[in-house]
Every structure is written in C-alpha cells, then in structure tokens.
UniProtKB/Swiss-Prot annotation:
This is Small ribosomal subunit protein uS13. The keyword rRNA-binding applies. One of its GO terms (cellular component) is cytosol. Keywords: Ribonucleoprotein, Ribosomal protein, RNA-binding, rRNA-binding, tRNA-binding. Transmembrane segments: none annotated. Coiled coil: none annotated. InterPro entries: Rbsml_uS13_C (IPR027437), Ribosomal_uS13 (IPR001892), Ribosomal_uS13-like_H2TH (IPR010979), Ribosomal_uS13_bac-type (IPR019980), Ribosomal_uS13_CS (IPR018269). One of its GO terms (biological process) is translation. Belongs to the universal ribosomal protein uS13 family. Part of the 30S ribosomal subunit. Forms a loose heterodimer with protein S19. Forms two bridges to the 50S subunit in the 70S ribosome. The gene is rpsM. Residues 96-121 are annotated as: Disordered. It comes from Streptococcus agalactiae serotype V (strain ATCC BAA-611 / 2603 V/R). The keyword tRNA-binding applies. GO terms for molecular function: rRNA binding; structural constituent of ribosome; tRNA binding.
Length: 121
C-alpha cells in the first residue's frame, strides 16, 4: 500500500480512485493531480514506480488535505458562531444551515424526535 498524505491508499484500485481515499481529494481533484504529475489515470497503485509516487506526493502536498483541511473547516464554523452570524447561530442550535425547512424534516440535524407529554387526544 502506498502512503500519501498520511493515508494508506489501496493497491489494487486505479490511482485516480485510490487518491479519493484522502480527505479533501475528490474525483476531479484526483484527475488534476495525475494530469499535473503526468501519470495515466488507468494505472494501478501497485504498478506505480517510486518516482511516480513521489510526483503524486509533491502534487498532494501543494493542496490542503486531511488534518489541515479539517482544522480549517472547524475554525470557519467556530468563527461563524463567534461573530453571531445567522449561519453561526444555526450551527450552534444544531439546525440546518442552508435554508432547508425544519417544520417536518431535518431529523438528521435535529436528532431523534422527542415526544411531548399530554399530546394524545
């Protein structure tokens, strides 16, 4: 298994798919990395030469991934909460942030439904 950005990527998959195991690298970013490194998308990870692995590592190091990216996202959310913006308030209350309705749905954000005593007829 090749190790890129602190993540073991699978050997038997194509490189373009294996790179998506790194947090912050999706399919389009993976394709851009391979194009910049001059490596075919169809090659398997186990068939990569050490030089090709190093080229991929150099390209990935230029992108914010894994811990740095997670930290930045968390700091952005924390900043929104501190300045008291609408989005920050929604984060603090555990409600949907992007304008979704909450009358009937939003169970994922709100958690399990809590029964109200004395509601039966």
């Amino acid at each position: 298994m090749a190790r890129i950005a602190g993540v073991d990527i699978p050997n038997d998959k194509r490189v373009v798919i294996s790179l998506t195991y790194v947090y912050g690298i999706g399919l389009s970013t993976s394709k851009k990395i391979l194009a910049a490194a001059g490596i075919s998308e169809d090659i398997r990870v186990k068939d990569l030469t050490p030089d090709q692995e190093d080229a991929i590592r150099r390209e990935v190091d230029a992108i914010k991934v894994e811990g740095d990216l997670r930290r930045e996202v968390n700091l952005n959310i924390k900043r929104l909460m501190e300045i008291g913006s609408y989005r920050g308030i929604r984060h603090r209350r555990g409600l949907p942030v992007r304008g979704q309705n909450t009358k009937n749905n939003a169970r994922t954000r709100k958690g399990k439904a809590v029964a109200i005593a004395g509601k039966k007829k």
